[in-house]
A protein has these predicted regions:
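Bacterial N-terminal signal peptides
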Residues: 9-15
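Bacterial N-terminal signal peptides that target proteins for export
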Residues: 1-7
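Gram-negative and organellar
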Residues: 24-429
Length: 429
C-alpha cells in the first residue's frame, strides 16, 4: 500500500506553461453551451488559445463512502493522480488566422482499501479542435474521445461538479463527440450556428451480481442564435436562440426523445475585469412513440467581477433538462448554483473559495408514474496558494486544496460523501 502511495505521489510535481487570459462575455456562452449538456467553456473553448505547450499534474487523496451505492455500507481510501498534456496554438480570437488544439487528460486511481479494487482504474480524454477565423467569419471543428471507468470517479479536469458524478458512480462509459460551428458577423449583428453529435457507450455494473450490462445513447443537437448590439445599451449584445435535436437510448423501449428549446440571450462585456452572459427560455420535450410531452423553464447566468480590492468573484447559475443516464425512463431537471472567490494577499499568498449546489428532480416520462426522487448535491472547496520566485518562470505557485462533496437523496440508496485533499505545483512561462 505504501509503495502505491509513493509512486502516485510523484504525480504531484508538475508544470503549466500558459497565460492568464480573461474570458469575455462572448466566450462565456456559445452554441456549445446549448448543444452540450456537460459543456465546460474553460476546457472546450478555443477562443483564448495562444502559442503554448502545457503540462499539469495533480495528486488527490480521496475518502469515499457508499462506493457501490449501498447506503454507506462500503467505504474506501483512494489516491487519484491527474495529468493534462497538450499543444495549443493560434493568435488572439479577434485576429484572423488559425487556432488549433490537441489535449490529453488522464485520471488514474489506486485503492488503499483491501476490500475495494478498481476494475477500470483510469479515465482517458482526448480532445482536439481547430478554429479558422476570417475577417467576418469563424469556423470551428472539435472532436473529442472520452473514456471513464465506473465507481467513485474524481472531479472533472476543469474543476466543475455536476449530477453526472453521482449518476456515474457505478457506470463506466465512452463518449465520442463531433462539433461543428460557424459564426458570421453582419453589419450590426452576429449569426451563430452550431451542430453536435454525441455517441455514448455505457457499461452498467449490476451491484449485486457484479455482471455488466451494455447500452447506448445517441444525441444530435443544433443551435442557431442571432445577437445584435442595441444603441441604447452600451457594451451589450441581445439575442434570440433556439436549440433542437433528438436523444435516444436504443435499449429503452419508450423510443427517442425530441426537444426544442427557444431562449432569449444577452451578453454584457463591461471591461476585462467584468463580464456577464445569460439566457432564459423553455425546453419542450416529446416522443413520437406515445403521448409524452413536457415543458420546463430553463435559464442560465455566467460571469465574473473584480472588486476594487482585487477580490475576484465568479458565478454560474444554470437550470437545464436532460435524460438520466442511470434511470432510463426518467428526465432530470437540475438547478445549479456555483460561486467562487479569490483574494490575493501580501507576500504572494492567495486564497480561493468555491461553493457549488445542485438540486436534481427526477421525473418519470411514463404516463401516470410518480416522481422517482430528488437529490441535493453540495460541494465546498478551499485552496491556499503561495507564489514562488523562481528564475526563468514568469509565474510559479504551490498550493494545497480541500474539497468536500456530499449527495443527499430522498432515497438513501443514492447518498454518498467524499473528502478530497490535494497538492499542486504550477509554473508559467
Amino acid at each position: 500500500m505504501f509503495r502505491r502511495f509513493s509512486i502516485l505521489s510523484l504525480f504531484s510535481i508538475g508544470f503549466l506553461w500558459t497565460g492568464h487570459d480573461k474570458l469575455d462575455a462572448n466566450e462565456l456562452i456559445s452554441s456549445s453551451t446549448f448543444t452540450n449538456t456537460n459543456q465546460k467553456s474553460s476546457l472546450d473553448s478555443l477562443s483564448f488559445l495562444q502559442e503554448r505547450i502545457s503540462a499539469q499534474f495533480i495528486t488527490r487523496y480521496l475518502q469515499n463512502s457508499n462506493i457501490f451505492l449501498r447506503e454507506n455500507e462500503t467505504e474506501a481510501d483512494i489516491i487519484n493522480a491527474s495529468v493534462q498534456l497538450g499543444i495549443k496554438g493560434g493568435g488572439l480570437p479577434t485576429d484572423p488566422g488559425l487556432s488549433y488544439r490537441a489535449l490529453y487528460g488522464g485520471n488514474y486511481f489506486s485503492s488503499l482499501t483491501d476490500e475495494f479494487e478498481y476494475d477500470s482504474p483510469a479515465d482517458h480524454n482526448f480532445l482536439s479542435g481547430v478554429e479558422l477565423r476570417g475577417a467576418f467569419t469563424k469556423i470551428r471543428l472539435n472532436a473529442n474521445l472520452e473514456e471513464y471507468g465506473g465507481y467513485a470517479r474524481s472531479e472533472p479536469f476543469d474543476g466543475g461538479v455536476s449530477s453526472s458524478i453521482g449518476e456515474s458512480r457505478n457506470l463506466g462509459y465512452k463518449r465520442k463527440r463531433l462539433e461543428i460551428g460557424v459564426s458570421r458577423e453582419l453589419s450590426t449583428s452576429v449569426l451563430d450556428l452550431g451542430l453536435s453529435i454525441d455517441d455514448y457507450d455505457y457499461q452498467f455494473i449490476e451491484i449485486f451480481s457484479g455482471s455488466s450490462v451494455d447500452y447506448d445513447r445517441e444525441r444530435v443537437a443544433a443551435d442557431l442564435s442571432w445577437f445584435f448590439e442595441p444603441t441604447f445599451l452600451a457594451k451589450t449584445r441581445l439575442g434570440l436562440g433556439v436549440t433542437t435535436g433528438q436523444e435516444e437510448v436504443p435499449q429503452n423501449f419508450l423510443g427517442a426523445q425530441n426537444f426544442l428549446a427557444p431562449s432569449l440571450r444577452a451578453k454584457w462585456n463591461f471591461s476585462p475585469k467584468t463580464a456577464f452572459a445569460g439566457w432564459f427560455g423553455f425546453d419542450e420535450r416529446w416522443r413520437d412513440s406515445d403521448d409524452f410531452s413536457e415543458t420546463t423553464s430553463v435559464y442560465g447566468l455566467k460571469g465574473f467581477w473584480t472588486a476594487p480590492t482585487d477580490t475576484q468573484l465568479s458565478v454560474d447559475i444554470t437550470k437545464q433538462v436532460y435524460p438520466s443516464i442511470f434511470e432510463l425512463d426518467d428526465n432530470v431537471a437540475t438547478k445549479k448554483f456555483s460561486i467562487g472567490a479569490r483574494q490575493d494577499f501580501n507576500r504572494g499568498i492567495s486564497l480561493d473559495l468555491r461553493f457549488f449546489y445542485e438540486f436534481s428532480d427526477y421525473q418519470s416520462t411514463k404516463s401516470g408514474s410518480l416522481r422517482s426522487r430528488t437529490e441535493d448535491l453540495k460541494s465546498f472547496r478551499v485552496s491556499l496558494g503561495k507564489e514562488m520566485n523562481i528564475n526563468y518562470f514568469e509565474d510559479s505557485q504551490v498550493s494545497i486544496f480541500y474539497n468536500h462533496l456530499t449527495n443527499d437523496s430522498t432515497k438513501d440508496y443514492y447518498d454518498f460523501e467524499r473528502d478530497q485533499f490535494g497538492l499542486q505545483f504550477r509554473f508559467s512561462l
